[in-house]
Amino acid sequence: MGGGVLKQQFVLHAPFLPCGDQPEAIRRLSQGITDGVPAQVLLGTTGSGKTFTMANVIANVNVPTLVLAHNKTLAAQLYQEFKAFFPENAVEYFISYYDYYQPEAYIARSDTYIEKSLLINDEIDKLRLSATRSILERRDTLIVSSISCIYGIGSPDNYSSMALTLEVGKEYPRSQLSSQLVRMHYQASSTPQRSAFRERGSVIDIFLAYESDLAVRLEFMNDTLISIEYVDPLTMIPSHTTSSITLYPGSHYVTPEAVREQAIRTIREELEQRMLFFEGRPVEQERLFQRTTHDIEMIKEIGFCKGIENYSRHFTGAAPGEPPTCLLDYFPDDFLLIIDESHQTLPQLRAMYRGDQSRKQSLVEYGFRLPSAFDNRPLTYEEARRYFHRVIYVSATPGDLEIQESRGHIIEQIIRPTGIPDPLPEIRPAKGQIDDLLEEIRQRLRKDQEKILVISVTKKLAEDIAAFLAELGIAATYLHSGIETAERTQILTDLRLGNIDVLIGVNLLREGIDLPEVSLVAILDADKEGFLRSSASLIQFCGRAARNIHGKVICYADRITPSMDHMLKETERRRKIQLDYNQQHKITPQPIIKPILANPITKEAGQEETRLKMQSSKELEASIKTYEEAMYQAAQEFQFDEAAKYRDLMNAAKKQLLFQKGEEENGD
């Protein structure tokens, strides 16, 4: 496994101290880790400050930490929160880097081959490489990850062995250095771009694969390195110097030459065996031979090929069926694993492997891939559990699995620092529920900044209710899995900004949606037993109203199901704990005030485009650089809407520059 090098301390920055039952939860969780307890549960209600508790535990135990979330939206939210808590430490983000992904597949019944199609998000690729660099270099690393952490990536041994350490005063033949950078997946380029380098006289500028704020400038006298400077990648203005530097590869799939040669030999051996298997099936034989030999030639020439991950077992030296190397292998043995919303995340861990294997079966069976492609896969749940040496399951509604594995090490965190108790749900008849809901919505629309969440049982019903309310002049929309991640984030922002008053959803409104403006949660057809109306789901839905002092929950049902009964009893129990605490400490519930990050250029966009038309060519070039820098900065902070506007301004400046240059040429 990978190991940390630098031994910095986690330094927690927080404008407040632990309160309520946070101090006891922090103490018990920290002590459990120190005592070697393998699994613990933090059972924390919505709004009780679970993330703050996690941050305190991380600071106390001071070991590399992986926080696992079940979707990208929650991972981004946790990443931002931990970045604020640990500004001095390496807080990283590791999710799937695909903006679009159509996996390779073959449908035998229609003889249809679907080639893999994808669009990689450059910014997320950078963040992934930054994450692995940090965990190999320093112990004060906290990585927030989606389920991507169990998918195969290159070996940490190969990755770290391809890192290049340079020291001032030593000799590095320039041609050899350039060749080494190419082998590390940096490309020679005359323009500044990530994972690239350029040579100008005695200087080599390297634009790092894992860093957008800094580039590296190497200055030579003949072949002797006389200076290493960090510079701004846009302006090339020096920031600071260093006497040595370690440069990490531009891809997780880099391999030393000896490993690559061995991999080519074993790929050829597997191909020969498969040719014998397909004896009498010339179509499959030819198909597999052509593809595999082409891939081998590409690996020989440039060390890479399209779909190289399907040969990953050959590069790691693993036996057939052995677990792939993944992000978890980059961590040292003593790392802490925190699984957020564990009741959702653990079932996801179980499901990933089965779906992957069923898709690849036909690819291998019909000669599109070698059988080793099966080993380019996510971990099975049993394989993933081998890394659970120190795990904290975090959930308001932990499942039976977490309860069982924790063996009684369950720490409750029920009390909210705000003093807001769980709203006690009202049960109303399902008959006429839409008319009753409409009246409740109208009551809240008369008040300022109170929003409504409506939980339906199907996507179609969510869309129909949104359309019905919109026809009545109510600002309503729906949210479900058919909507892209970026658009979901924008919808939630619009709700907080007041552009939307009513949001109708199915399942996405359960965990992690932090909306203090929501004063009413209406659960339609609450008596329809099933996954979306289980006691855990109902408790999670009710928690969405527990951030507002006027919070109210209405369950529309004609009967009280066992799940509803459990939800009502558990809500009453938690409510009593909070009210008793409030009375004992003379606490008056206070509303949560959570700032909304406004877009600083929304009102000025039109003025900016007008100003561009008045600029000279030189000024436009400067504006393009400024907008590009602002775009990447906004993307780093996960303000994607803001980043898109800077992108549009950058493109407008580029068009204006082309127009002006055309006019200048015509004028000449």
From Swiss-Prot:
Residue numbers binding ATP: 44-51
Record domain Helicase ATP-binding: where: 31-416
Family matches, as Pfam families: Helicase_C (PF00271), ResIII (PF04851), UVR (PF02151), UvrB (PF12344), UvrB_inter (PF17757)
CDD domains, sorted: DEXHc_UvrB (cd17916), SF2_C_UvrB (cd18790)
Gene3D superfamilies per UniProt: P-loop containing nucleotide triphosphate hydrolases, UVR domain
Any GO molecular function: DNA binding
Record keywords, A-Z: ATP-binding, Cytoplasm, DNA damage, DNA excision, DNA repair, Excision nuclease, Nucleotide-binding, SOS response
Entry keyword annotation includes Transmembrane helix: no
InterPro entries linked: Helicase/UvrB_N, Helicase_ATP-bd, Helicase_C-like, P-loop_NTPase, UVR_dom, UVR_dom_sf, UvrB, UvrB_inter
Transmembrane among keywords: no
Segments passing through the bilayer: none
Any single GO BP term: SOS response
Domain UVR: 621-656
Subcellular location: Cytoplasm
Domain Helicase C-terminal: 433-596
Positions of short motif Beta-hairpin: 97-120
GO cellular component: cytoplasm; excinuclease repair complex
Family note: Belongs to the UvrB family.
Domain notes: The beta-hairpin motif is involved in DNA binding.
Reported function: The UvrABC repair system catalyzes the recognition and processing of DNA lesions. A damage recognition complex composed of 2 UvrA and 2 UvrB subunits scans DNA for abnormalities. Upon binding of the UvrA(2)B(2) complex to a putative damaged site, the DNA wraps around one UvrB monomer. DNA wrap is dependent on ATP binding by UvrB and probably causes local melting of the DNA helix, facilitating insertion of UvrB beta-hairpin between the DNA strands. Then UvrB probes one DNA strand for the presence of a lesion.
Subunit structure: Forms a heterotetramer with UvrA during the search for lesions. Interacts with UvrC in an incision complex.
Protein name in the entry: UvrABC system protein B
The organism of origin for this protein: Chlamydia trachomatis serovar D (strain ATCC VR-885 / DSM 19411 / UW-3/Cx)
